[in-house]
Amino acid sequence: MEKRTNKMGIDNQKTSFEHQSLEVSMLDKDNFSDEELDSYLSKGEIKATDKVTIPPKILFVGDCTIATFGNFSASTGKAKSKKTFNISAMVAAAVTNTTVLNYRACLPEGKRKILYFDTEQSKYHCHTVLERIYKLSGLSFKKDDPRLMFWGLREYTPKLRIALIDYALRKYDEVGLVIIDGLRDLMYDINNGKEATDVMTVLMAWTSVYDLHIHTVLHLNKNDNNPRGHIQYSVNSYVID
């Protein structure tokens, strides 16, 4: 794909919704034309004559399915509770389509690429996570494996992080699994109900439009076992224990 320059506004962290998907651009709109409404309605229509297949099951813990295409899941835990280590094992299993620790993966051909977005760690710590995944996968450190792409989005605003994830999903083909480590960092205010709903909406849109699975990480408060902010009420049913 030809590289687009100055479209994402990296320097000043402004985004141009002209170049975003409908799924993301709709979040900042209050009014829709009849043409737009007709397009959305047509995309959402369910017909008896539709040929609908069962979504592939791609991740397991033992005999329990924890991930299918068209859905998303979440992990929670306090700081230093090995959340990222568990995610590393999950990704390592997905990269190799084998069993790593407690996780077993079975991604279909043509959907083997994994995109990993970390929203809060430094480049050094992101690289440490990537090294751990390679080690668990048995991959060589001498070359980058094309099945796994990793980005650190710590320095960007929540709106730009969403735009970058959306751009990556449009840019790269054959994606089957997306990791977002730091879901709260896609929001400006974790206690804002509208923002929480918007983030959930875009997650559901991405999984549906691109037919993949998204696994997110939510962080617990230090003094209790509750995920931080209003977003907790939206994702509780998606949490993997």
Language-model regions, residue ranges each:
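The Walker A/P-loop phosphate-binding site
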Residues: 24-133, 140
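Conserved inter-motif catalytic segment of the P-loop NTP-binding fold
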Residues: 108-194, 198
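Short, small/acidic-rich helices and loops at N termini and domain boundaries
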Residues: 1-37
